[in-house]
Amino acid sequence: MIATKLNPALSAVLAVTALIASQPAAAISITFDYSYDTSGFFAGHADRQSLLNQAASEFTTRLQDQLTAITSRGYKHFDAKFLDPSSGAIVTKNDYDIAANDLVVFVGGQNLGASILGEGGPGGYSASGFSSLALNRGQNTTTDFGPWGGAISFGNSANWYFDQDATTTESFSGYDFYSVAVHELGHVLGFGSAPSFGALVVNNQFTGTASSTLYGGSVPMGDDSHWKQGLTSTANGVTQQVSMAPGISASQRKHFTELDFAGLKDMGWEVSPVTAVPVPAAAWLFFSGLAGLFGFARRRMA
């Protein structure tokens, strides 16, 4: 199963498978930065990088937000902050620029412990000379969320399954790297950590309109702001367990389901509908840690 807990180390330093019939043009892009992959988890492994891009496409084909650029010039300074995906150390990139409609995600691998598959979340920042609206990329922080990107670490000792083509469904052993990447990207987008998400959690129930309408009532939450383990929804017309539950089993594939997308919609992301022709669908824990300094939040999957 996947469990969500507070990460003490973080709080100490920082508080598909379908044929698409019709689909609007993507509005956002996700760029993976391997410059902190000092452990070599991705170096020389084109298959792993390809799977990351395939995981990102689950979001870039559905999210239609218009994110403003962040440009450090003159008196305007934007310093991006995140945890090094290969060491966990705090990284600050001074006068960092982000292109319009792009999210940058730093990725790498490290020893995350005996049961941790991945760790990820949106990055933080310190800045001067920018308005609050500009820092949040033109999004209202009360009802929306506009990160610059974030970071994801993958456990380098996990028994991974690296699919050659995530659009196919076959039996496999090990833990599905693609599914973990999709889950952690959900956290980079603010699932479980964005203020606009937290504002909708009441008595451990998620009360967002889109999610409640789809589920048939308030959605029960699991540990540390995941969906409750065992909830199901559909992805490309196929019923499966939700991606943003706190756990995944070996030999299990999880796409980002309609309930997962509804959660993003409720926290402010503009999610387009999709028409698809479905094909047949064929534990470790997701650990989630929140941190507060500079608005940084990071999630872990184990």
Functional labels for PLM-detected ranges:
Residues 21-23:
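N-terminal signal peptide c-region/cleavage motif recognized by signal peptidases
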Residues 10, 26, 222, 280-282:
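Intrinsically disordered, low-complexity segments enriched in proline/serine/threonine
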Residues 299-302:
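Short, charged juxtamembrane terminal tails flanking transmembrane helices
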Residues 2-12:
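Bacterial N-terminal signal peptides that target proteins for export
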Residues 27-182, 188-275:
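Extracellular zinc-dependent metalloprotease catalytic-domain scaffold
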Residues 278-297:
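A short, hydrophobic C-terminal helix/tail in secreted or cell-surface proteins
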